[in-house]
Amino acid sequence: MSITSQKKKSLISTYAIKEDDTGSSFVQCAILTERISNLTEHFKAHKHDHNSKRGLLILIGRRRKHLNYIKRKFGNEAYQELIEKLGIRK
């Protein structure tokens, strides 16, 4: 369910604005998206795991807040580009 450090490093290098940029909203959205997709796969086998379902909803809300910040701060073009790169809908 968690992300390996190698996967996290590859996400950081892909979405970072500057070198060693781990805190930008772009990177955080990418990491949250990976965690959400891992949890979604987990629920295919464990349908009644309600505690993890709550954690998933919290992660989705956190990603939504980061995406709203990106849209407000960097504009609609950066927002749309990030959504396409991540492969999420909105």
Curated annotation (Swiss-Prot):
Q: Which Gene3D superfamilies match?
A: 6.10.250.3130, S15/NS1, RNA-binding (1.10.287.10)
Keyword check for Ribosomal protein, yes or no: yes
Record carries keyword RNA-binding: yes
**Keywords on record:** Ribonucleoprotein, Ribosomal protein, RNA-binding, rRNA-binding
Annotated SMART domains: Ribosomal_S15
Pfam families for the chain: Ribosomal_S15
> Please, which domain of life does this record's source organism belong to?
Bacteria
What one GO molecular function would you report for this record?
rRNA binding
Q: Which GO terms describe its biological process?
A: translation
- Can you quote a single GO CC term? cytosolic small ribosomal subunit
Query: How would you summarize the oligomeric state and partners of this protein?
Result: Part of the 30S ribosomal subunit. Forms a bridge to the 50S subunit in the 70S ribosome, contacting the 23S rRNA.
NCBIfam families under this entry?
Answer: S15_bact
Similarity field: Belongs to the universal ribosomal protein uS15 family.
Q: What functional role does this protein have?
A: One of the primary rRNA binding proteins, it binds directly to 16S rRNA where it helps nucleate assembly of the platform of the 30S subunit by binding and bridging several RNA helices of the 16S rRNA. Forms an intersubunit bridge (bridge B4) with the 23S rRNA of the 50S subunit in the ribosome.
Give the matching HAMAP family.
Answer: Ribosomal_uS15_B
This protein is called what?
A: Small ribosomal subunit protein uS15
Q: Name the species this protein comes from.
A: Wolbachia pipientis subsp. Culex pipiens (strain wPip)
